[in-house]
């Protein structure tokens, strides 16, 4: 039995009994005066968006220290603040997100998943969680036959428009809320978020990425990276930044103007045009060898390779449990913590096996 398989036995705590244990542990820490000591508490939720939102509210109410595990038939997610004081990540899990509002049956079902890694404050990531899927659905022409037959070039345009609208919304919101938000910086426009989103259809997976969160497809036991990290020292990104009049300064790694460690993001109005919200988009056909899709923030990818992440997911899959996606997500967060990741860690695992994912 591999280490990953052993971890699966203890990584995920599900049900009322686990929730009671988590509450008891939190109470003991409060009485001992060590609240916020950074231990990982997982609170399981029921499947669906309502469960996700309830668990997120509970995590935020506890000051961002508690972990979040979401269990559903087609996907699982885990999110933990880790060694950070605040939780600034957000995840979005929206099944059949493009269903027509009038109750008609959509031409083809598709699901939406996203990971948003905020910086400076959580409100941009939170806004992306609440709105990005709606904007993508609107730009798709929700449920129309044209959406089902969309070509790769059209998908690129769809995602670019969606990200541009999301960027404009959060910048306008930041200006309106400036001075009333608990941001790290003096100004609300110093806040932003990465965005890696996936639209999963019956025949393909569409990924749009802006920042250094990442999407990896596990296919036949091997990883296929579906997005490219936007780092300031990536040659093409460095050229783009300098052409716009900006600079990349190496201070604890490559940073735009010595500040931001990514070259694309939602928000960050004070760094435009050097930091752009234009996503890179990939359209990948699904195959019978596909196992799962992993979306995660750099809190995972900084310390766990694509290969290791797929190995963990496969180990959980081989156990044959219905909740294996949630197990894999939780094991990956625990692995990142064990390897001393210094950031928030959020992981979404989507079942892509034929007959299971859709």
Swiss-Prot record:
Cofactor or coenzyme needed: Mg(2+); Mn(2+)
GO biological processes: regulation of intracellular signal transduction
Subcellular location: Nucleus; Cytoplasm, Cytosol
Gene Ontology molecular function: metal ion binding; protein serine/threonine phosphatase activity
GO annotation, cellular component aspect: cytosol; nucleus
Catalytic activity from the UniProt record: O-phospho-L-seryl-[protein] + H2O = L-seryl-[protein] + phosphate; O-phospho-L-threonyl-[protein] + H2O = L-threonyl-[protein] + phosphate
Inducing or repressing factors: Induced by salt, osmotic and cold stresses. Induced by abscisic acid (ABA).
Positions that bind Mn(2+) 1: 117-118
Annotated EC: 3.1.3.16
Cofactor binding remark: Binds 2 magnesium or manganese ions per subunit.
Additional facts recorded: Plants overexpressing P2C68 exhibit insensitivity to abscisic acid (ABA), and tolerance to high salt and mannitol stresses during seed germination, root growth and overall seedling growth. At adult stage, P2C68 overexpression leads to high tolerance to salt, mannitol and drought stresses with far better physiological parameters such as water loss, fresh weight, chlorophyll content and photosynthetic potential.
Task of the protein: Involved in the regulation of abiotic stress responses. Acts as a negative regulator of abscisic acid (ABA) signaling and positive regulator of abiotic stress signaling. May be involved in panicle development.
Record-given protein name: Probable protein phosphatase 2C 68
